[in-house]
Swiss-Prot record:
The active site is at H94 (proton donor/acceptor). Residues 325-355 are cytoplasmic. It comes from Oryctolagus cuniculus. The lineage of its organism: Eukaryota, Metazoa, Chordata, Craniata, Vertebrata. It catalyses: hydrogencarbonate + H(+) = CO2 + H2O. Its EC number is 4.2.1.1. Keywords: Cell membrane, Disulfide bond, Glycoprotein, Lyase, Membrane, Metal-binding, Signal, Transmembrane, Transmembrane helix, Zinc. This is Carbonic anhydrase 12. Disulfide bonds join C50-C230. It is found in: Membrane; Cell membrane. GO terms for cellular component: plasma membrane. Belongs to the alpha-carbonic anhydrase family.
């Protein structure tokens, strides 16, 4: 090789060796995070869709809701997974993920949507509000997402993920309350997937048991993935009714996991892995039920408040009517006291007249 070529190669290698550390991939392998330089506010720089249209999550409130009688109950096919199989539970560096079998799918949507995985979003022990969607401004403790792809049109989730309505996600809102034995079938294994990249095989169970009561009541809208690349490809179904988990179960979720690998010198707790509410724009949210509006700060429906107000006005009218009736009756009785009294003017006796 000519000397000039060797010299050029040496310069090139030296230049590569002197590249700044920031050009290397992060040690934990993450291309994005929820906070810091690669946090949610910077996602759009690497993933343009994150700053684009139809982004999720959103706040579900009365001004955007429209009742849609065509929204029928979903059919959950293959959700009761055979006991002779196993689920794979893994820490993917962003959440805890449960991989789902390909014979699990949804019916009742425009196409058949096959399940691929489920995962959760949550807050932290000091601020235990970590749901992504909110309802009337109310944020819940956590949120479960069951992810499906349009298997009628696409061969796999990778192909479907950036297509219009290529994905369908079921969202379950989770609040603190009673112990939930169904969710514990996931939570009891969290200690085995403490760090990114760890996984464990766990017994199968009926995924439908993770859904809330009255699953026929839900919100439906077109939105996006809530994590990069944020493709606006999701047909969202957010169930109206939340499920509960206990304080102990919520604490386990908030403290058991790390974003980082076991050998990372700067471990980071997996907390606050939720995206803030996004601009709603001109979209509509369709509801499969007739919405009962709740007046903020009261916990009472608008209908109940209007009924109470109407009853109060009616009560005042009745009181006024009774008062007027008594007043008129009293006035009439005074006039009646003078009846039968004959007024005779004084007549001077004739004897007095001729005195």
């Amino acid at each position: 090789m000519p000397v000039g070529s060797l010299r050029a190669a040496a310069v090139l290698l030296l230049g590569i060796a002197q590249l700044p550390p920031s050009s290397a991939a992060p040690r934990n392998g993450s291309k994005w995070t929820y906070v810091g330089a690669d946090g949610e506010r910077s996602w759009f720089k690497k993933y343009p869709s994150c700053g684009g249209r139809l982004q999720s999550p959103i706040d579900l409130h009365g001004d955007t809701l429209q009742y849609d009688a065509s929204l029928t109950p979903l059919e959950f096919q293959g959700y009761n997974v055979s006991a002779d199989k196993q689920f794979n539970l893994t820490n993917d560096g962003h959440s805890v993920r449960l991989n789902l079998p390909p014979d699990m799918y949804l019916q009742g949507l425009p196409s058949r949507y096959t399940a691929t995985q489920l995962h959760l979003h949550w807050g932290n022990r000091n601020d235990p509000y970590g749901s992504e969607h909110t309802v009337g401004g109310k944020q819940f403790a956590a949120e479960l997402h069951i992810v499906h792809y349009n298997s009628d049109s696409y061969p796999d989730i990778s192909t479907a993920s950036n297509k219009s309505e290529g994905l369908a996600v079921l969202a379950v809102l989770i609040e603190k309350g009673y112990f939930n034995p169904y969710y514990d079938r996931i939570f009891s294994f969290l200690r085995y997937v403490k760090y990114k990249g760890q996984n464990v095989r766990i017994p199968t169970f009926n995924i439908e048991e993770l859904l809330p009561e009255k699953p026929a009541e839900y919100y439906r809208y077109r939105g996006s993935l809530t994590t990069p690349p944020c493709y606006p490809s999701v047909l969202w179904t957010v169930f109206r009714n939340p499920v509960t988990i206990s304080q102990e179960q919520l604490l386990a979720l908030q403290t058991a996991l790390y974003f980082t690998r076991a050998d990372d010198p700067a471990p980071r707790e997996m907390i606050n892995n939720f995206r803030p509410i996004q601009n709603f724009g001109v979209r509509l949210v369709h509801a499969s039920f007739q919405e009962v509006q709740i007046l903020p700060g009261t916990g009472l429906s608008v209908g109940i408040i209007l009924s109470v107000a109407l009853a109060g006005v009616l009560g005042i009218c009745i009181v006024l009517a009774v008062c007027i009736w008594f007043f008129r009756r009293k006035k009439g009785s005074k006039k009646g006291d003078n009846k039968g009294v004959i007024y005779n003017p004084a007549i001077k006796m004739e004897t007095e007249a001729h005195a």
